[in-house]
Amino acid sequence: RETAPKGANPDMWDVDKKGEVISDDKEFGGKSIGVPGSVKGFLYVLEKYGNLDRKAVIQPAIDLANNGYRVSAIMNMDMKNQMNNILKYPATAKIYLKNGKPYNVGDLLKNPDLAKTMEKIVKDGEKAFYEGEVAEAIVKATVAAKGKMTLEDLKNYKIKISDPVKGTYRGYEIYTAAPPSSGGAHIIQILNILENYDMKNIPAGSARYYHLLSESMKMAFADRAKFMGDTDFIKIPL
């Protein structure tokens, strides 16, 4: 997964008296961008465990980006909800807006620049993304948005192999992503709370069902806010 750029530090955020970040910089803009790990991670898994080559795996996505795909109702809603943020970044607006407005449901959306990037990855592997033209474009855009990423950050990115988090639910073993990903551990926590109730006989969609689910999630998210983090730096009571 992504990592913080080497130049990231607590002082880059504006915080209030409680230590909470005042602006939305932690969600949008250059400061919120980590050094991307997906490309290197996916290629590692493909090489170690796969039996297809890069072209066979990536070509369908290239075709989709070049030929386009139909905008769904959910995507249309997301475009409308994020209009203000999309408009801040011309390159993003060029892709996800049509004449300055969200694409309509059913419109064809193409992303040829993404296709070109994936074609480079097919040809040259991870180096095509973490060095050279693509890396330079990533850093340029990030720095322009007040981010901290450098070419060195990209070139030096290393994947980390972690043991999965393991839990149980009604006799089933569950294996899921380890921290700093928070979803896995807290999904197990939520399930462990819910297994104290006879969920099988509580109608899905009923008030009782949603009440138990929301209360379980509330407790999990409270623990997430208090304890979750990166195990390279803190100890987490898993």
Residue ranges with predicted function:
Residues 48, 67, 120, 144, ...:
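A structural signal for alpha-helix termini and helix-coil/disorder junctions
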Residues 197-238:
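Internal maturation/activation junctions in enzymes
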Residues 1-131, 135-178, 182:
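Noncatalytic scaffold domains of N-terminal-nucleophile
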